[in-house]
A protein has these predicted regions:
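Bacterial Sec-dependent N-terminal signal peptides
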Residues: 1-27, 305
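N-terminal, active-site-proximal structural segment of metallo-dependent hydrolase catalytic domains
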Residues: 23-90, 100-104, 179-180, 194, ...
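Metal-dependent phosphoester-hydrolase catalytic domains
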Residues: 26-29, 80, 118-120, 129-133, ...
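Active-site glycine-centered loops adjacent to acidic/histidine catalytic or metal-binding residues
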Residues: 45, 154, 199-200, 291, ...
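Second-shell loop/turn segments in exported
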Residues: 46-51, 68-76, 125-128, 164-173, ...
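Extracytoplasmic, non-cytosolic globular domains
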Residues: 53-72, 134-238
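Structured beta-strand-rich core segments of catalytic domains in phosphoester-bond hydrolases
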Residues: 71, 77-156
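C-terminal outer-membrane/trafficking sorting elements
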Residues: 308-389
Length: 389
């Protein structure tokens, strides 16, 4: 039977419109990741935005608003004018887009929690175009009074899986060289700073040593760690790039954040936006991107935690971690003690003046997370971290 071509075209157009309607009707607004108690950062390649016109733009705006995170590092933004309109329609967020022929890198950040110190590109010279076809984009920011550095990247794609050291035309070597130069820059300029390196790094963490483009970081576990390493070595259903099943979008941290990474409330995950769309990943890939976002949320411990001045106070806190009830042993203190407990944002939870030489029993109210126990006794002051599970 011969089918009228006009009818086929009409049915095809109708199907696309119905899919778009389903997309609008689905629960993108139910996506969530950010909280008031944590710092959240997300890397997301949105595949030369907009992949499918206004449907893409509308959906990306809803996703950004629903994620409710502090910082998004984005790659592959083609229509910068349209993307700026999208972000302008998301309450409480601002946009920075890198300029340049092969840019496509951007930051979207929450203005109520993130104070930008500076944003700039590094390795811009033509000498570095081979390892960095897109110059890394550095954001120096302050979150709740704490300094954090984020470096957004989009490494060279493709290759054959074999690292040919010294071959400047080898894609794996170009990614290796980019990793080497990034580490060199961080070691030189941010040796004691909290640094988060993120982006579409276009390679997997689990390659053998000989072919691993990230070996310079993996060889220095004292100072660097991939926060998403468990995802990389886990089930393929959780990977960031399902079309060619692999996990190639990463979040790397420096040792100043190791403690925060292990704290209660920390989460690192591939955010499966496709789970909130009726067509699953096929619909997500059609309308939005072939990459899923990868996010990390942590409770940032103030840099002053652990600071002690004066003589040893011989104070013990137990159990630590706790589920709420805690005892603070002041029996070795020979003077009355001012005790205060705050959360990591400085909100007062408990204050009291304690007689010398007592054990104080308390119930720490509030959600699981990090609390700071401050004690002043005579001319001695200490700040100790208390973890509530």
């Amino acid at each position: 039977m011969k089918i009228n071509q006009w009818l086929l075209n009409t049915l095809s157009t109708t199907l696309i419109l119905l899919m778009a309607g389903q997309l609008d009707a689905q629960s993108l607004s139910d996506i969530s990741f950010g909280t008031d108690e944590t710092f959240e950062v997300v890397t997301w390649n949105i595949e030369w935005f907009p992949k499918n016109g206004t449907a893409t733009a509308d959906s990306v705006g809803r996703i950004i608003e629903s994620l409710d995170v502090d910082v998004l590092g984005l790659q592959e933004i083609d229509d910068t004018t349209l993307f700026r309109q999208v972000v302008n329609n998301v309450p409480g967020y601002e946009l920075f887009i890198a300029e340049g022929w092969f840019g496509g890198l951007a930051y979207v950040y929450k203005t109520s929690t993130v104070n930008i110190q500076s944003i700039y590109k590094i390795y811009e010279s033509s000498l570095f175009w081979n390892p960095f076809p897109r110059s890394p984009l550095v954001m120096e920011l302050t979150f709740m009074g704490e300094d954090i550095v984020v470096i957004n990247n989009h490494f060279k794609c493709c290759g054959n899986g074999l690292l040919d050291m010294g071959n400047s035309s080898d894609e794996e070597y170009r990614r290796y060289e980019a990793s080497f130069l990034l580490k060199e820059y961080i070691d030189t300029n941010f040796s004691s700073s909290r640094v988060i390196v993120l982006g579409d790094l276009n390679d997997i963490l689990t390659d053998n040593y000989a072919n691993n483009v990230f070996k310079v970081f993996l060889e220095d576990p004292t100072n660097y760690r991939f926060a998403d390493e468990e995802i990389a070595s886990g089930a393929s259903t959780d990977w960031s790039y399902p079309g060619w099943p692999s996990h190639i979008d990463h979040i790397l941290i420096t040792n100043e954040l190791f403690g925060d990474l292990s704290n209660p409330g920390t989460e690192v995950q591939t955010i499966k936006v496709d789970d909130f769309m009726s067509g699953g990943f096929s619909s997500y890939d059609y309308y939005i991107s072939d990459h899923r976002p990868v996010g990390m949320k942590i409770q940032v411990t103030p840099a002053s935690v652990g600071f002690v001045e004066g003589s040893n106070t011989h104070i013990e806190i137990f159990p630590n971690p706790t589920h709420g009830k805690v005892s603070i042993d002041l029996t070795q203190c020979n003077a009355p003690t001012e005790l205060s407990i705050t959360d990591v944002h400085g909100k007062s939870i408990y204050t009291m003046r304690c007689p010398k030489g007592e054990v104080i029993d308390l119930n720490v109210e509030g959600p699981a997370g990090i609390y700071l126990v401050s004690l002043e006794s005579g001319d001695t002051k200490s700040v100790t971290r208390l973890i509530k599970e």
